Each structure stands twice: as C-alpha cells, then as structure tokens.
C-alpha cells in the first residue's frame, strides 16, 4: 500500500525566522501533505520533523532573535511518488 498519492507537486513558502512563525510552518506543511493525500500518521510525523527543524533554526541559528527580518523557506516536493 502506497503512503503517498501518485502525483507530482511542489510548494514552498517563506516565513520570518521567529518562534511566532512555527504555527504557520506546521499549518503550511499539513496543507501540502493533505493535498498529497499522505496518511494521517505519516503526515503528523513529517510535520513534527519539519517543525523541529524550523524551531532549531529559530533557537540556535538566530538565538531566538525576535528582531530578525531573516526568512526561512520551507519547500515540500513530491516527484515520482518520492518526497
């Protein structure tokens, strides 16, 4: 049984590098994974992994600098049934 629907799709979005963007990162990821028809368990694991990576960028790379105008870009692509 396939975990991912057979379709090619790519989306990316830029977010400000601050902790208030993390909810938007999760929402964006969930939306893309829903379009790809990924099962709920896998979707939530992927959202968690991407959100943790984004949180590490905010926490470690920018030291929780709320004044940062820097952007982080999340891109999710599926080609030939591969994320």
Tell what function each PLM region has:
Residues 11-24:
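STAS-typified acidic loop motif
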Residues 1-12, 57-83:
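Conserved beta-strand-loop-beta-strand hairpin that lines the nucleotide-binding pocket
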Residues 17, 38-41, 69, 78:
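Structural signature of the histidine kinase catalytic ATP-binding subdomain
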Residues 52, 56:
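Conserved polar catalytic motif of the HATPase_c/GHKL fold
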Residues 21, 34, 66-68:
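A generic structural signal for solvent-exposed, polar alpha-helical segments
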Residues 27-51:
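Conserved short strand/loop->alpha-helix "switch" segment adjacent to the catalytic nucleotide/phosphoryl-transfer site
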């Amino acid at each position: 049984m396939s975990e991912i629907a057979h379709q090619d799709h790519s989306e990316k979005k830029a977010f400000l590098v601050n902790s208030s963007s993390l909810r938007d990162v999760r929402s964006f990821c969930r939306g893309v994974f829903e379009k790809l028809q990924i099962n709920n368990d896998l979707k939530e694991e992927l959202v968690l992994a991407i959100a943790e990576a984004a949180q590490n960028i905010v926490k470690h790379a920018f030291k929780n600098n709320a004044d940062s105008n820097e952007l982080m870009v999340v891109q999710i692509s599926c080609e030939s049934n591969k994320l």
